[in-house]
C-alpha cells in the first residue's frame, strides 16, 4: 500500500496521540489510525509567532489530543518548530482559570480583598459601574483604557475597536504590538503611505543574499529559517549575513557574521547609503521615477517622562515626527560623514565586513532581502532605522520584486492582522485609517452608522503612557486582554505595578491562566484559548488565515469576543454619548451599545452556520447570529477598493490563507509592482500608491546616541529577548512539560572574560542590578548565546525572574515603541 506525504504526516501525529494515550497501533494500519482512533483533523494557524504556520489539529472526545504540521500549507510545508509540535498541550495546564474572580472583602469588591468567584453578570456590573463613574466625574473617555494584543483574533480586534472608539468614545486602546511592531508600522506608513511588507516568503527561494538585522530567526522564526537554510545550502552563490550585538544560533549559517555595538546600526546603514552614492551605484532610473527625498527632525528625545533630564534637553521633542522636503544633494550631505572609518569607529565592526555588506546592497546583479525583528524595532530610534533600511533598498531599486525587498518580521500571530490591519492602536482605525484624519473618521462613522462626531480625534494613551497615566491617576480603568504586561512591559517596579495597585483604579485581566498580570489585577476573567473559539489571524506576509472552533473552553471560560460583545449590553447610549450626538440619531435613544454596534443590520445579518456539521460556534449559539462573519464582512468594507482588499469570509475557511490585496479572487505576492499588484497600472512598472504622487520617501536622519549607556557603576550593556523553547512571558509554553523541561529557568549569558573580572564562574548565582531594579539569575558563559565583552543577555519568559524590573521605559519618540535592547547594568555574585 502506498503512503503519500500527507498520510505520512498524519500517521506521525496519530502515533504521537497513541503514545500519549498509552496504546499501540499496528504498523499496517498506521496511515489510517486517525480514523480508527476517532480523531478528527482540521486546519488552524499556529498560536505562536508571526510566521503563520498552519497546523492540523486532532480532536477526540472534546479535547485536542494532537497537532501536526500541515503538509498542504505553503508557509511551513508540513513542518513545525518545537513549540508548534506541542500545541495540543497549551490549553490543558492544571491551573486554568475557569470562573470570574473578583477581589472581595465583606461580600463586596475591595482593592485589597481576596480573589473570590463571581458570576459574569457581577463581574461586568463592577466594570460597567466603574466606567460610568469615570465618565460622569472626568468627562474624558480617554480615562478608560484597554490594552490588548497581537494574539487576539481579527474578529476580536474589530469588536474591541468598535466598542472602545465608537461605543465608549475612548481612543485609549493599544496593543502589546506597540512594544514590538510600532516602529515598523510607522516607518512603513511614513515611507510608502501604507503599512506592511511589499514582499512575501516566496522571496526566500528567489534571492541571492539574506541580511538579518537584529533577528535570531533560527530560534524566533525557525520555520522560515529552515527555508533560508535550504536556500543557502542549495547554492554556493547565496550568501547570509547575520548582524547582532551578540552571537546566537543564526550565526551558525552566516557567511559574514557581524557583531556591532548596541545602537550603532544607525551608523552602519548610513554608511551603506553613503557607499552606494560614492561608488555610483544609485539606480537613478528607479530613484527619479519612484522616490522623493525628505529630511527628518533631529534631537527628538527618548520618550521618557517629560521631566526627565534627557527630555528637558531635547530641542525637538514636540516635533519628533516631522519630515521636511529635501532633495538628493541634502541627503548626500547627511550620510557623507558616515565613511568606512567612521562606521567602524562607532560600530566596532571590522572594516572588511562593513565593506562586504555595503557591496552586497550596492551590487545591481545581486538580489537581496533584509529581514529584521526586535533588534531594529525595540530601539529609541526604531522608526529611523526602519527608514534607513528602506533607504538602501530604494536607492538601489531592490524592492517590490521577487527576491528583493525589506521585510519586517512580526513576533505575534496576528500583530499584522489584528493590531495593524484592524487598527487597535490609539491613533488608528481599520485599513490604515487614523482618528486624526477627518475624512477617515467620516468613513468609519458612515460604515458604523454613527452620529457625526462620535469618534474622537484625540489619540489616547499608548502602552508605556498607559502605565504612567495609571500611576498618575489620569487613567482609572484598564482592561487587559490576551497579554501579560506585568511581566512583559518595561520598568515594572517604577511604572507598571504602582499604577495597577493605585486605589483609584480598576484593573481587569482576561486570561486563561494566573499570569503575573492576572494575580496583580482586581478582576480576572477566564478566557478561551486558540481553537476553543473560531478565529482569524494575519501573518507577516499579509496572509489572512481562518480556523473553526474545535472544542469548548473549560468551566465558565468565554472568548474575548464574547466578553467584548456581551459587555456592550451593560451601557445605554444616554450613559456614554452626549445629547448632541443623540439629537442627530434619536432612534438610538434607550438602546444599548450592543444594539447600536452589533445589531446594526450588518454585523447580525448572517445566520448561524449550518453547512459545517460537527462543529460548534459558542458565540453564534449565544447571540443567535454568525457574529464572526458579520464582523469580518463589515470590517473588510473598510479596505476593499483601495489596496487592502480581503476575500469574502467563506473563502478563507476553504484555503490555507490568502495574501492581501485579494482582487477577483487572486492574492498579491509583490505589492507596488506591475504584473503582480492589481493596483499598479500597465506601464507604471512600480507605483507606491499609498501616496497621491505614487512615490516612496527616502529619509535623511543621523546617528544619535542611546538613552542610557554603561558607565563606571553600571558597566555592562543589558539586552533582553527570547529563547527557542518559550514564547514571550511563558504563560503557555511553561505549562507544556516538554518545553519546561527543555529550558526550565531563565539565565544570564556573559562573556567568560567579564565573568572572570567579577570573580564569577559558569553556573554561579548572580544578581543583575540597574537603576530601576534587580533580579536573581544564574550565569551561563558556555551556552547557545555568546556575548561579546561588555554585554549580557537575558530573557523574560520566566515569571520567577522578572527581567523587566531592570529595563528602561525609554521609547522611540515617534512610534512610542519600547527599547528593551539597551540599558546599563551591573552584575554581582548573589
Swiss-Prot record:
NCBIfam families: NAPA (TIGR01706), PRK13532.1 (NF010055), TAT_signal_seq (TIGR01409). It comes from Mannheimia succiniciproducens (strain KCTC 0769BP / MBEL55E). It catalyses: 2 Fe(II)-[cytochrome] + nitrate + 2 H(+) = 2 Fe(III)-[cytochrome] + nitrite + H2O. Catalytic subunit of the periplasmic nitrate reductase complex NapAB. Receives electrons from NapB and catalyzes the reduction of nitrate to nitrite. GO terms for molecular function: 4 iron, 4 sulfur cluster binding; electron transfer activity; iron ion binding; molybdenum ion binding; molybdopterin cofactor binding; nitrate reductase (cytochrome) activity. Belongs to the prokaryotic molybdopterin-containing oxidoreductase family. NasA/NapA/NarB subfamily. This is Periplasmic nitrate reductase. It is an enzyme of class 1 (oxidoreductase). Its cofactor is [4Fe-4S] cluster; Mo-bis(molybdopterin guanine dinucleotide). Binds 1 [4Fe-4S] cluster. CDD domains: MopB_CT_Nitrate-R-NapA-like, MopB_Nitrate-R-NapA-like. It is found in: Periplasm. Predicted to be exported by the Tat system. The position of the signal peptide cleavage has not been experimentally proven. [4Fe-4S] cluster binds at residues 46, 49, 53, 81. Keywords: 4Fe-4S, Electron transport, Iron, Iron-sulfur, Metal-binding, Molybdenum, Nitrate assimilation, Oxidoreductase, Periplasm, Signal, Transport. PANTHER family: PERIPLASMIC NITRATE REDUCTASE, RESPIRATORY NITRATE REDUCTASE. PROSITE patterns: 4FE4S_MOW_BIS_MGD, MOLYBDOPTERIN_PROK_1, TAT. Residues 39-95 form the 4Fe-4S Mo/W bis-MGD-type domain. Mo-bis(molybdopterin guanine dinucleotide) binds at residues 83, 151, 176, 180, 213-220, 244-248, 374, 378, 484, 510-511, 533, 560, 720-729, 804, 821. Its EC number is 1.9.6.1. It holds the Pfam family Molydop_binding. Component of the periplasmic nitrate reductase NapAB complex composed of NapA and NapB. Its main location: periplasm.
Amino acid at each position: 500500500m502506498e503512503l503519500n506525504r500527507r498520510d505520512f504526516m498524519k500517521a506521525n501525529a496519530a502515533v504521537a496521540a497513541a503514545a500519549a494515550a498509552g496504546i499501540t497501533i499496528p504498523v499496517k494500519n498506521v496511515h489510517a489510525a486517525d480514523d480508527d482512533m476517532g480523531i478528527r483533523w482540521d486546519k488552524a494557524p499556529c498560536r505562536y509567532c508571526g510566521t503563520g504556520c498552519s497546523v492540523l489539529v486532532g480532536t477526540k472526545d472534546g479535547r485536542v489530543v494532537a497537532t501536526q504540521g500541515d503538509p498542504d500549507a505553503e508557509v511551513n510545508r508540513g513542518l513545525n518548530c518545537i513549540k508548534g509540535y506541542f500545541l495540543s498541550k497549551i490549553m490543558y495546564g492544571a491551573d486554568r482559570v475557569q470562573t470570574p474572580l473578583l477581589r472581595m472583602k465583606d461580600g463586596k469588591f475591595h482593592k485589597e480583598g481576596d480573589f473570590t468567584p463571581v458570576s459574569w453578570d457581577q463581574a461586568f456590573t463592577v466594570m460597567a459601574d466603574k466606567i460610568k463613574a469615570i465618565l460622569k466625574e472626568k468627562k474624558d473617555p480617554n480615562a478608560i483604557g484597554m490594552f490588548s494584543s497581537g494574539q487576539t483574533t481579527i474578529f476580536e480586534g474589530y469588536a474591541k475597536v468598535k466598542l472602545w472608539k465608537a461605543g465608549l468614545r475612548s481612543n485609549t486602546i493599544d496593543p502589546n504590538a506597540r512594544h514590538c511592531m510600532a516602529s515598523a508600522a510607522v516607518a512603513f506608513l511614513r515611507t510608502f503611505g501604507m503599512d506592511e511588507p511589499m514582499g512575501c516568503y516566496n522571496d526566500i527561494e528567489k534571492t541571492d543574499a539574506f541580511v538579518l538585522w537584529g533577528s535570531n530567526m533560527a530560534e524566533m522564526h525557525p520555520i522560515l529559517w529552515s527555508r533560508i537554510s535550504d536556500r543557502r545550502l542549495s547554492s554556493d552563490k547565496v550568501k547570509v549575513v547575520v548582524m547582532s550585538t551578540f552571537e546566537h544560533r543564526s550565526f551558525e549559517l552566516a557567511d559574514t557574521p557581524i557583531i556591532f555595538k548596541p545602537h550603532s546600526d544607525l551608523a552602519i546603514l548610513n554608511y551603506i547609503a553613503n557607499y552606494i552614492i560614492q561608488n555610483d551605484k544609485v539606480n537613478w532610473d528607479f530613484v527619479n521615477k519612484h522616490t522623493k527625498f525628505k529630511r527628518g527632525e533631529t534631537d527628538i528625545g527618548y520618550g521618557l517622562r517629560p521631566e526627565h533630564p534627557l527630555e528637558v534637553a531635547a530641542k525637538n521633542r514636540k516635533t519628533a515626527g516631522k519630515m521636511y522636503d529635501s532633495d538628493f544633494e541634502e541627503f548626500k550631505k547627511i550620510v557623507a560623514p558616515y565613511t568606512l572609518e567612521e562606521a567602524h569607529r562607532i560600530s566596532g565592526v571590522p572594516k572588511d565586513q562593513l565593506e562586504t555588506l555595503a557591496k552586497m546592497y550596492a551590487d545591481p546583479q545581486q538580489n537581496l532581502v533584509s529581514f529584521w525583528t526586535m533588534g531594529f524595532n525595540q530601539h529609541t530610534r526604531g522608526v529611523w532605522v526602519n527608514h534607513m533600511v528602506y533607504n538602501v533598498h530604494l536607492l538601489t531599486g531592490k524592492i517590490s520584486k521577487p527576491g528583493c525587498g525589506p521585510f519586517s518580521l512580526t513576533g505575534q500571530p496576528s500583530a499584522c492582522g489584528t493590531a495593524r490591519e484592524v487598527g487597535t492602536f490609539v491613533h488608528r482605525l481599520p485599513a490604515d485609517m487614523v482618528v486624526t484624519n477627518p475624512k477617515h473618521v467620516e468613513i468609519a462613522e458612515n460604515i458604523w452608522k454613527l452620529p457625526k462626531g462620535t469618534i474622537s480625534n484625540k489619540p489616547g494613551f499608548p502602552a508605556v503612557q498607559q502605565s504612567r497615566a495609571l500611576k498618575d491617576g489620569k487613567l482609572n480603568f484598564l482592561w487587559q486582554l490576551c497579554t501579560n504586561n506585568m511581566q512583559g512591559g518595561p520598568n515594572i517596579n517604577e511604572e507598571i505595578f504602582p499604577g495597577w495597585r493605585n486605589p483609584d483604579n480598576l484593573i481587569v485581566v482576561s486570561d486563561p491562566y494566573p499570569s503575573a498580570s492576572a494575580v496583580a489585577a482586581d478582576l480576572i476573567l477566564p478566557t478561551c484559548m486558540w481553537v476553543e473559539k473560531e478565529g482569524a489571524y494575519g501573518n507577516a506576509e499579509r496572509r489572512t488565515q481562518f480556523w473553526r472552533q474545535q472544542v469548548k473552553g473549560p468551566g465558565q471560560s468565554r472568548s474575548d469576543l464574547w466578553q467584548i460583545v456581551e459587555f456592550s449590553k451593560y451601557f445605554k447610549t444616554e450613559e456614554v454619548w452626549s445629547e448632541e450626538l443623540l439629537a442627530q440619531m434619536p432612534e438610538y435613544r434607550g438602546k444599548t451599545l450592543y444594539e447600536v454596534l452589533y445589531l446594526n443590520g450588518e454585523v447580525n445579518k448572517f445566520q448561524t452556520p449550518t453547512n459545517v456539521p460537527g462543529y460548534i460556534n459558542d458565540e453564534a449559539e449565544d447571540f443567535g447570529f454568525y457574529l464572526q462573519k458579520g464582523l469580518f464582512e463589515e470590517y473588510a468594507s473598510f479596505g476593499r477598493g483601495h489596496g487592502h482588499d480581503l476575500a469574502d469570509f467563506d473563502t478563507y475557511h476553504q484555503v490555507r490563507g490568502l495574501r492581501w490585496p485579494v482582487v477577483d479572487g487572486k492574492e498579491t505576492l509583490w505589492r507596488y509592482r506591475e504584473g503582480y499588484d492589481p493596483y499598479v497600472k500597465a506601464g507604471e512598472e512600480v507605483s507606491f500608491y499609498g501616496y497621491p504622487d505614487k512615490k516612496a520617501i527616502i529619509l535623511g536622519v543621523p546617528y544619535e546616541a542611546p538613552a542610557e549607556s554603561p558607565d563606571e557603576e553600571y558597566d555592562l550593556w543589558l539586552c533582553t529577548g527570547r529563547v527557542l523553547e518559550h514564547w514571550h512571558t511563558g504563560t503557555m509554553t511553561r505549562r507544556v512539560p516538554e518545553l519546561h523541561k527543555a529550558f526550565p529557568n531563565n539565565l544570564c549569558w556573559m562573556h567568560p572574560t567579564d565573568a572572570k573580572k567579577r570573580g564569577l564562574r559558569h553556573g554561579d548565582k548572580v544578581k543583575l542590578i540597574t537603576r530601576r531594579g534587580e533580579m536573581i539569575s544564574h550565569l551561563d558563559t558556555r551556552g547557545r548565546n555568546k556575548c561579546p565583552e561588555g554585554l549580557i543577555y537575558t530573557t523574560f519568559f520566566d515569571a520567577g525572574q522578572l527581567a523587566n524590573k531592570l529595563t528602561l521605559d525609554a521609547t522611540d519618540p515617534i512610534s512610542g515603541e519600547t527599547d528593551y535592547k539597551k540599558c546599563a547594568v551591573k552584575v554581582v555574585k548573589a
